[in-house]
Each structure stands twice: as C-alpha cells, then as structure tokens.
UniProtKB/Swiss-Prot annotation:
The active site is at H17, D114. This is Hydroquinone glucosyltransferase. Its EC number is 2.4.1.218. It catalyses: hydroquinone + UDP-alpha-D-glucose = hydroquinone O-beta-D-glucopyranoside + UDP + H(+). PANTHER family: GLYCOSYLTRANSFERASE (PTHR48046:SF6), UDP-GLYCOSYLTRANSFERASE 72E1 (PTHR48046). It comes from Rauvolfia serpentina (Serpentine wood). UDP-alpha-D-glucose binds at A343, Q345, H360, W363, N364, S365, E368, E384, Q385. Keywords: Glycosyltransferase, Transferase. It is an enzyme of class 2 (transferase). It comes from the Eukaryota. Belongs to the UDP-glycosyltransferase family.
Length: 470
C-alpha cells in the first residue's frame, strides 16, 4: 500500500464540472504529493473530447470508468439536473466497489463529490471516509444552496413570482426569475433533486469552492461565519484549465488574432454545452455585423428546443455556418473569423488582441476572463448562469447584459449597441479597469502566500493528519 494520502473524486456528468475538478486534483498531486483517483459514473460511451481529456491526466491522477447506467425508463423531456443526480444514484453500487478497492490499496483520506453528487456520501459514511464537496461555481450559488431549505419553507409560490428581490446571505439581492434553472419549477423533479442535494450539504466535512476572497467577499464571509452544523468552506480558486493540446499550437484563430490591433476583437462563445435558437442566431449574426467591430465567433448550430443542447455531447454534427444570414460572410469579410464548434478559449482570452468576451456566463468561462482581465457581455443560457450574470452586471460591474424584447429574443440593435458599448464606450473602459484589478487580485490569491494557496494547504494538512492518525 502506498503511503501518500489519496483522494477519491466522483464527478457528475459534463465537462464544465470535470475541468475544474481535474485542476484541483493536479494541485493536490503537484504541490502536496497526493494521489487522486477519479471514479467516473457514465450513461454510455464517453464523448471523444472527454476521453482525450482524461487520457492526458498527469502521473498521480488516475481514473476508473464505472459501468454505464440506463435511463430507458425516463421520459424524453427529463431535465438535465435530474439526469445528473440519477447518474450518481444509479452508480452507487459501482462507486462502493471502487472505494472498497482504493481502501485496500491506498491511504484514502477523503471522498470528494461535486455539486449534485452528495448521494455518494452514503458510501463515504459506510466506509468511514471523510465526505467533501468540490463546488465548481460561485460562492453566491453555494450560499443559495445552504439557504434553499429555509427559503423552501418561507416562500409558498414559485420563486420567479415573488415581486421583490430575494436576499441570499452575503449576496446582492436577486429576483427569483434569475435563480438557477432547477429552482424555476418547484413541482419538477429537478427542483426536488436540488432541494435534496442542498439538505445533504451539511453532511460534508468541508466544501472547496472555485472562487477567491477578493472576487466574492460578501458570500464567502457569510459562508465562513460560525453556524451550527455548517461545514468549513475553502475558497481555492481560480482553478482554470490551461489549453495545452497540440491543436492549439497551429490554430488558425491565434494566427488571425496576431494580425489584429490590440484589444480590438470581441470573442463570442457559448461554452461546451450552450446553444441559441435559430431566430436568435440570426439576430446575433446581424447584431455583430451592425456593430462594425472585429469579432471571433465559435459558431455552433442553433437549437430551437433547449439551451443546453450539447451538454452531454460536445460534438456538433450540423454545419453551423449554413444557418448564417445570406451574404453575412461577404459583408463581414476581413473583420471576423468564424470557427466551427471548438476554439482554444484560454489562449484566445489571454491574447493581446482580445478586448471583450460575449459569454454564456458559465463559471469556468468567467474565471478565465477574470484571470486575463477581459470585460464581458453577459448572455446566460442555462444552469446557474442567470445568477452569474446578475453578479457580473450588478455586483462586480464588469459586464453589459443586453435585454430581450417581448418576444424573448435579444434584437440585433440591442446586440450592436452592447458590442459597441463594451469595445468602444465609456462603460467598457470602466469594466476593463475593474477587470484589471480583479486579474491582479486573482494572481495574488494564487501566489505562494495568497489566500487560495493557503486554503488549499490548510485542507491538505487536514487530510495528511487524517491518514497519519489512522
């Protein structure tokens, strides 16, 4: 049996959950000499991008794929959060076997799950392994998770129907309509899953959150206040992925950026899981054209049914460029580059020519922007992204959020004005300055004596003591 402390990590489905958890694992291995094994539940073959990502894990980080669970009994319209929770629940016998093997072969100090994975705590408790949560998004959203059981009892109607903003401890007031998606329909199984998970958060011995003190001082202060039964919270971020694949080196888009003036390009991407409707796709294209700004757009095929259309499968089969308005490519020639499906986001955001980012407000994307000091246009699509947009626009004041019309679409003029405002306007200058301050704060948090580095060291010390006392 090896003598280094070992951590088991159980991610829920989705690259957005896996990427920061892997970055966390790398820090434990490289800085604190831990071993990590990912226990990965599945519901079928892994998407190619996820398989490549896992196969590139460094020494000291291993993974085991669990047998696929079946969802044949679920209706076609089951919500994504329900499916994520059930992936864990239905995999528990396999998680148990994997943990049993690790206990026999390693010094297992903790079982770490992510935000919807607390049903795996049953296995940790059975084997007397410390249960922890890695929370991949904001401290604001984590504060809502802790507050939700109380809110559930206090509010009788749908949260979106409460006329005044709701107060989450430590956070700016937020309207119920901007709560995370599964809280929008309290009769749906997805809300029941959310509430079930939230109630189990107090079973954790600690929660690591992918944020840092200067980014979210209010929510973190509220979370770290003494409260009977609330676990300690460790802000260890920003944990972001460094693009290091070979296809980055000769990427056409980086060569194109090299030829553009400094800070002149708006980057547009809706993340690995996001899609907009066909009509919205057209308005976005025409708005970008009207703005007369340079832009680099990761184009994915529109989807009229769901905003998280590519969440479980990053490959996008259709030719997205075929959906563009007629003549669009000719009219924007020379000032735009369209990239189908994938682009090296971290490299693009760190490039000197990139001056703004139109984002779906996924937390990984926001953190990458913060680390590179790039101001934003907030275009939330699903999950907790509306909450993130409120935080960016009203809390941090680093983003514009174009408004949708009565038909639910954000119109081309509104889009053009937002793009011009960010890239050329006074507001854009203010956002850029604030983002520069946050970039410096992020760098300080990750420095040798920074707050996030210290929080990780405190956690590692706790886990080391755990195995030395057993």
């Amino acid at each position: 049996m090896e003598h280094t402390p070992h951590i088991a990590m159980v991610p829920t489905p989705g690259m957005g959950h896996l990427i920061p958890l892997v970055e966390f694992a790398k820090r434990l291995v490289l800085r604190h000499n831990f071993g990590v094994t990912f226990i990965i539940p599945t519901d079928g073959p892994l998407p190619k991008a996820q398989k490549s990502f896992l196969d590139a894990l460094p020494a000291g980080v291993n993974y085991v794929l669990l047998p696929p669970v079946s969802f044949d009994d679920l209706p076609a319209d089951v919500r994504i959060e329900t499916r994520i929770c059930l992936t864990i629940t239905r995999s528990l016998p396999f998680v148990r076997d994997a943990v049993k093997t690790l206990l026999a072969t390693t010094k297992l100090a903790a079982l770490v799950v992510d935000l919807f994975g607390t049903d795996a705590f049953d296995v940790a408790i059975e084997f007397k392994v410390s249960p922890y949560i890695f929370y991949p998004t904001t401290a604001m959203c984590l504060s809502l998770f802790f507050h939700l059981p109380k809110l559930d009892q206090m509010v009788s109607c749908e949260y979106r129907d409460v006329p005044e903003p709701l107060q989450i401890p430590g956070c700016i007031p937020i309207h119920g309509k901007d709560f995370l998606d599964p809280a929008q329909d309290r009769k749906n199984d997805a809300y029941k899953c959310l509430l079930h998970q939230a109630k189990r958060y107090r079973l954790a011995e600690g929660i690591m959150v992918n944020t840092f003190n200067d980014l979210e001082p209010g929510p973190l202060k509220a979370l770290q206040e003494e409260d009977q039964g609330k676990p300690p919270v460790y802000p260890i971020g920003p944990l972001i992925r460094a693009d290091s694949s070979s296809k980055v080196d000769d990427c056409e888009c980086l060569k194109w950026l090299d030829d553009q003036p400094r800070g002149s390009v708006l980057f547009i991407s809706f993340g690995s899981g996001g899609a907009v409707s066909h009509n919205q796709f057209i308005e976005l294209a025409l708005g970008l054209e009207m703005s007369e700004q340079r832009f680099l757009w990761v184009v994915r095929s529109p989807n009229d049914k769901i905003a998280n259309a590519t969440y479980f499968s990053i490959q996008n089969q259709n030719d997205a460029l075929a959906y563009l308005p007629e003549g669009f490519l000719e009219r924007t020639k020379g000032r735009c580059l369209l990239v189908p499906s994938w682009a090296p986001q971290t490299e693009i955001l760190s490039h000197g020519s990139t001056g703004g980012f139109l984002t779906h407000c996924g937390w990984n994307s926001i953190l990458e922007s913060v680390v590179n000091g790039v101001p934003l246009i907030a275009w939330p699509l699903y999950a907790e992204q509306k909450m993130n947009a409120v935080m960016l626009t009203e809390g941090l004041k680093v983003a514009l959020r174009p408004k949708a019309g009565e038909n639910g679409l954000i119109g081309r003029v509104e889009i053009a004005n937002a793009v011009k405002g960010l890239m050329e306007g006074e507001e854009g200058k203010k956002f850029r300055s604030t983002m520069k301050d946050l970039k410096d704060a992020a760098s300080r948090a990750l420095s040798d004596d920074g707050s996030s580095t210290k929080a990780l060291a405190e956690l590692a010390c706790k886990w080391e003591n755990k195995i030395s006392s057993t």
